[in-house]
């Protein structure tokens, strides 16, 4: 077993594992992800027999916390080939990536797990649950106006969201 961080020019080598484990993602999304998102991310892997068997991606994000910009990494694409699971690979990848983020002075990281129980042993906790609401235009309400957002609405929606979040949370 060999744990290492891939060099930028090696990132593409993890795509076949991504496609195997995240088969629900469309080919178009995977192409976008490996063309755009892996330009500036970090990919930790575990290799056996010269092949990538497990991986973890750190995608960089800038966050606003208490009016200050903070750089953080979003943990994504944590995957292990089925026949290599239950060997502690995910734990090793998490430990190494968390150590590296700590050494780099990063105050926190985050992820959106498929199942919260997977990450509880690593002290990750749910800090936010997104509520989903569905409205149909056929059901008019005096309080709610429903219309499809256009590209022109994006700036106004972002400003509204940022104002609301700043007033209600420390972001």
Question: What is the role of each PLM region?
Answer:
Residues 13, 17, 96, 156-159:
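Alpha-helical elements of Rossmann-like donor-binding domains used by nucleotide-donor carbohydrate transfer enzymes
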Residues 90, 97-103, 115, 151-152, ...:
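Long alpha-helical, hydrophobic tracts
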Residues 3-78, 163-171:
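A conserved beta-strand-loop-helix scaffold within acyl/acetyltransferase catalytic domains
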Residues 98, 103-109, 145:
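Short active-site oxyanion
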Residues 61-63, 83, 116:
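Short coil/turn motifs at secondary-structure junctions
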Residues 75-101:
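Conserved acetyl-CoA-binding loop-helix of GNAT-fold acetyltransferases
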Residues 103-107, 113-131:
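Conserved active-site alpha-helix within GNAT-family acetyltransferase domains
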